[in-house]
């Protein structure tokens, strides 16, 4: 969730600050068959030689920006089976309806009229594409024993479609002339843009076939713009790089916009796309077949576009143009164009040389759009054997220690073309932005909202201490009542290896102070935060606070004001006092090792109490002598218990990538599998009361179902091997708030089931609107379906079962949690599970409501006879996805 909220907020924030009053005028119309009057879908509407245009929808409707004012006076309409039309336009043209005449013969290739049903059988376009797919292995560089090449990438973020002649903007440019100086004309769209951020990366790609390995050596990084206003500004560039990943059309599938796409040059693509031969044309000096392609369903995740294939026996792709269909179900994207150009090396090898992407993004149509431009150049290819030492360094991506400090001479060598005036003056532009009256308050608010922290520094004196998280300042719970908290953490500006953080909280109901202090030493220097990848650190902490047993399952801070509102009354707490020493070592291959030594004391509070079975026997014998207040706080109770633990954990997530926020590190590549294994040893040392062994393991995997979305699966299991009282048994991960949280049960109460062996399955299916997109009244809403099922198997062995007669007077086992009713009856709130009857809850929901809201109806299917059971509920969360 967080990773896309960052990008969505940035887009909205830029749109609000620089939102301009008027948009470029549009030309709209309907394209029909001159003979039948029927609408013609998938007609290409474009300005010749320009990457600006659109495609008609199923009703033959189209819209395109009017570019006559900048000299683009001719609009071209082309479609297989129809004669191409070129129409003269002027700046006043608003409506343009087109009648197209069938033309069955197109440049040596006979095709069937468009109005006939598309067939892949005996289709010359499909037969040609099969030859292209069969020949692509000959152009696959991964078949080489070795290769290396230089890669240059420039990623520019700009405000799109700037109206310099608008009255509102004229006054703004007059007041702030540096804004006008920053405006330039896009060489692709012809629109006026205002660049606000740029990042250049120069790298070398190394590859060997046996053993197969590829490494990226980042030699230089040059970054500037509004992202520099944020100390975690790398979030924006990291997100953009993940969303707009490089595309290899020779792969069967590739990841783009955080979704898998079928390549038009693949076996699966032949089934996914419709292909049409348009003409034979020359690209540079090479004669090529010109093909167009469209998805079978324009709302599925696929491209429309053009392929230019050499008209010789090699069937190599000379040029590829990818566009996103107007009716695509992808959020935020107004338009997208990718142009890839291939060429032959002196060695005869065929390689990608230029990759140019332009994307226009807007969170809302009422806000100005943002243009993302990515230019990638590939050069200096080599195929000689590479020394083994080049592959000895760990990690797929290795950053040169001087990458961020390259001078102008370096960039003159690696930069294939000069920066524009606006791009080269980005730092000066940001300095001018800082001088705008009130701008610092906008940045302050933006930082607080995005980062959830308030900085204490300035531009000249970067923040050494950040105050936050902000959303934990005020919260409430059963013990504290109203709770106020002050938190802070140091940054690498104070020390690049040593970090401090902590909080002080006060509860107005129990009138007690709570606190936490932590010191962490990182063995690697950090740019800002200790959590930056990869982690290699040791930390010591001391905490005293009240905790509900279910708090440990929260993915957010327990004092998060939004999750402090519970669906049930949570009144069973501990006062927890914990001293902890934690060592973490994370390797570039995705393997993370954690060792934790902790010493904790738990004192029951609220309506939680600890009473051994032997003490319960004495309690029952003397029940009549006790007052109701003593039923849950009797002289027979165990006031507290103490543990000393050593925990060893291993986590393996190959290919996982992250963005760093000031509160936590957020994974942005959810396709990576995750394997976890953890063993905890309880030692009867340092005053601890129990000795035990606990083992838990887990697996996560996302499986894509083609056009039917994806299924996320979590499988977990664990065993408490020893005889222990109930606080040390295994309780389900219960989510007691209204906010959805991954990996937890929505309708299980606090400690509702206690087991010493368990297995759980959590499956969530995001259908990506596959069904709702086919319902006419709902299609335009772009709602997406979500189905889920959560299951829990659990059992309690005899040695840990306090309900068995042989354990009635046991001095270690404790009676399960519950509450005394007014008549003195004890009602349990924790229960045993039937090992042959798993707990099941299902959910059905809709997300992408207003592009941001996810709502689910959850239903509990069994164990509803329990007095504390909640049969159903409504849960929600903020979630933005493409």
Model-derived regions, located:
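Bacterial Sec-dependent N-terminal signal peptides
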Residues: 1-30, 45, 104-113, 530, ...
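Structured extracytoplasmic
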Residues: 115-288, 294-302, 364-468, 472-475, ...
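Short, acidic Ser/Thr/Gly-rich low-complexity loop/linker segments typical of extracellular
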Residues: 51-61
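Structural motif
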Residues: 30-40
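Short, acidic, small-residue-rich periplasmic hinge/interaction motif at the N-terminus
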Residues: 32, 44-46, 78-80, 94-141
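A short, solvent-exposed loop/turn motif at the edges and junctions
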Residues: 47-49, 74-87
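Hydrophobic beta-strand segments
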Residues: 43-47, 75, 111, 149, ...
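Exposed, low-structure sequence patches enriched in small/polar residues
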Residues: 259-260, 393-882
């Amino acid at each position: 969730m967080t990773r896309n909220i960052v990008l969505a907020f940035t887009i909205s924030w830029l749109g609000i600050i620089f939102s301009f009053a008027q948009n470029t005028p549009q030309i709209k119309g309907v394209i029909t068959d001159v003979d039948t009057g029927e609408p013609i879908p998938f007609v290409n509407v474009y300005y010749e030689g320009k990457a600006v245009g659109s495609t008609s929808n199923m009703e033959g409707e189209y819209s395109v920006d009017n570019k006559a004012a900048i000299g683009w006076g001719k609009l071209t309409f082309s479609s297989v089976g129809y004669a191409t039309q070129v129409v003269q336009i002027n700046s006043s043209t608003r409506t343009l309806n087109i009648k197209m005449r069938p033309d069955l013969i197109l440049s040596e290739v006979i095709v069937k009229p468009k109005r006939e049903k598309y067939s892949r059988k005996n289709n010359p376009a499909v037969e040609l594409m099969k030859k292209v797919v069969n020949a692509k292995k000959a152009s696959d560089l991964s078949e080489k024993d070795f290769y290396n090449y230089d890669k240059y990438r420039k990623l520019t973020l700009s405000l799109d479609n700037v109206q310099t002649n608008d009255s509102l903007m004229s006054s703004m440019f007059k007041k702030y002339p540096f804004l006008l100086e920053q405006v330039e004309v896009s060489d692709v769209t012809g629109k006026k843009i205002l660049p606000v951020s740029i990042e250049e990366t120069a790298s070398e790609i190394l590859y060997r076939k046996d053993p197969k390995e590829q490494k990226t050596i980042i030699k230089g990084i040059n970054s500037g713009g509004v992202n520099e206003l944020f100390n975690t500004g790398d979030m924006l560039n990291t997100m953009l790089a993940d969303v707009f990943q490089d595309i290899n059309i020779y792969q069967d599938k590739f990841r783009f916009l955080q979704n898998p796409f079928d390549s038009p040059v693949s076996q699966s693509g032949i089934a996914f796309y419709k292909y049409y031969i348009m003409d034979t044309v020359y690209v540079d000096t090479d004669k090529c077949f010109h093909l167009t392609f469209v998805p079978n369903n324009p709302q599925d995740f696929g491209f429309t576009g053009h392929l230019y294939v050499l008209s010789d026996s090699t069937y190599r792709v000379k040029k590829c143009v990818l566009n996103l269909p107007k009716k695509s179900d992808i959020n935020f994207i107004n338009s997208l164009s990718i142009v890839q150009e291939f060429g032959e090396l002196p060695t005869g090898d065929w390689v990608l040389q230029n990759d140019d992407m332009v994307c226009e993004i807007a969170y809302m149509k009422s806000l100005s759009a943002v243009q993302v431009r990515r230019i990638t150049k590939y050069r200096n290819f080599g195929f000689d054997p590479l020394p083994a030492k080049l592959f000895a360094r760990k990690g797929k991506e290795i950053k040169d220690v001087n990458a961020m400090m390259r001078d102008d001479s370096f960039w003159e060598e690696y930069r294939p073309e000069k920066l524009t005036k606006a791009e080269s003056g980005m730092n000066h532009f940001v300095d001018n932005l800082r001088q705008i009256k009130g701008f610092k308050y906008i940045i302050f608010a933006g930082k607080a909202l995005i980062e959830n922290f308030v900085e204490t520094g300035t531009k000249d004196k970067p923040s050494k201490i950040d105050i936050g998280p902000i959303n934990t300042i005020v919260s409430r719970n059963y013990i504290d009542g109203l709770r106020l908290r002050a938190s802070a953490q140091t940054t690498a500006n104070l020390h690049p290896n040593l970090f401090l953080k902590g909080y002080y909280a006060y509860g107005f109901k129990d009138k007690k102070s709570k606190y936490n202090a932590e010191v962490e030493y990182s063995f690697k220097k950090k740019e800002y935060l200790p959590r930056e990848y990869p982690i290699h650190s040791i930390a010591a902490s001391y905490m005293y606070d009240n905790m509900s047993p279910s708090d440990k399952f929260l993915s957010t801070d327990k004092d998060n004001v939004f999750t402090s509102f519970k669906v049930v009354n949570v009144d069973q707490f501990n006062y927890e006092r914990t001293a902890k020493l934690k060592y973490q070592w994370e390797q570039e291959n995705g393997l993370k090792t954690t060792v934790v030594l902790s010493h904790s004391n738990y004192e029951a509070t609220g309506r939680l109490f600890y009473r051994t079975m032997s003490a319960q026997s004495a309690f029952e014998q003397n029940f009549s002598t006790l007052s109701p207040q003593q039923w849950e706080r009797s002289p027979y109770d165990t006031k507290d218990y103490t543990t000393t633990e050593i925990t060893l954990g291993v986590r393996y997530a190959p290919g996982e990538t992250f963005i760093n926020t000031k509160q936590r590190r957020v994974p942005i590549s959810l396709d990576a599998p995750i394997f976890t294994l953890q063993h905890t040893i309880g030692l009867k040392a340092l005053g601890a009361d129990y000795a035990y062994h606990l083992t838990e393991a887990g697996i996560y995997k996302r499986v894509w179902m083609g056009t039917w979305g994806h299924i996320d699966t979590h499988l977990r299991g664990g065993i408490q091997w020893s005889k222990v009282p109930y606080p040390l048994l295994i309780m389900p991960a219960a989510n007691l708030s209204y906010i959805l949280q991954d990996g937890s049960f929505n309708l299980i109460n606090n400690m509702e089931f206690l087991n010493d062996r368990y297995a759980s399955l959590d499956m969530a299916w995001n259908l990506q609107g596959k069904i709702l997109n086919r319902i006419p009244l709902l299609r335009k809403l772009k709602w997406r379906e979500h189905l889920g099922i959560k299951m829990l198997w659990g059992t309690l062995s005899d040695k840990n079962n306090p309900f068995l007669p042989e354990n009635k007077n046991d001095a270690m086992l404790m009676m399960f949690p519950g509450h005394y009713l007014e008549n003195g009856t004890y009602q349990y709130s924790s229960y045993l599970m039937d090992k042959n009857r798993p707990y099941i809850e299902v959910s059905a929901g809709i997300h992408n409501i207003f592009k941001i809201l996810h709502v689910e109806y959850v239903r509990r299917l069994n164990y509803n006879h329990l007095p504390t059971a909640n049969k159903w509920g409504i849960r929600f969360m903020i979630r933005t996805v493409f």
